[in-house]
From Swiss-Prot:
It comes from Clostridium botulinum (strain Hall / ATCC 3502 / NCTC 13319 / Type A). Keywords: Amino-acid biosynthesis, Aromatic amino acid biosynthesis, Lyase. PROSITE patterns: DEHYDROQUINASE_II. Homododecamer. Its EC number is 4.2.1.10. This is 3-dehydroquinate dehydratase. It holds the Pfam family DHquinase_II. It catalyses: 3-dehydroquinate = 3-dehydroshikimate + H2O. The keyword Membrane does not apply.
Length: 147
């Protein structure tokens, strides 16, 4: 069985309430349910982790290598400046795909740069919750099933 960890960063626990014109009305719990439902017929276990604390995200990334085949991460605001999360992502030997619900390139200037993208295989941005599904599909079709 393949194991994938989905990590969500700060304020994503506020989805459904926070800036619905940008992020929509869907909650993080609804997103997690949609992901699980989409992959219900796969030989796949998906775990979800959300934290507003940088250190907890770093710890989760570092310990993930022991248990997971890959990570899908939405670092949220940390993507724009967290060298510590970037370094944690670089320190592990499993693939990481970065996801953003909104199109960061259509947002404020300071949101258009993702430092964490440097340690990601790729970045999926602007497709809402479906970006997570796209990331997991990529992982399954191009990385995990090839082994």
């Amino acid at each position: 069985m393949n194991n994938i960890l989905v990590i969500n960063g700060p304020n994503l626990n506020l989805l459904g309430k926070r800036e619905p014109d940008i992020y929509g009305n869907i909650t993080l719990e609804n997103i997690n349910q949609k992901i699980k439902l989409h992959f219900k017929n796969e030989d796949l276990k998906i775990d979800f982790f959300q934290s507003n604390e940088e250190g907890k995200i770093i710890d989760k990334i570092i310990e993930s290598e022991k248990k997971y085949n890959a990570i899908v991460i939405n670092p949220a605001a940390y993507s724009h400046y967290s060298i510590a999360i970037l370094d944690a992502m670089r320190s592990i030997n499993i693939p990481v795909v970065e996801v953003h619900l909104s199109n960061i390139y259509k947002r404020e200037e300071y949101r258009k740069k993702s430092v964490t993208a440097e340690a990601s295989l790729g970045v999926i941005s602007g497709f809402g919750y479906y970006g997570y599904i796209m990331a997991i599909e990529f992982i399954l079709n191009n990385l995990v099933r090839e082994r």
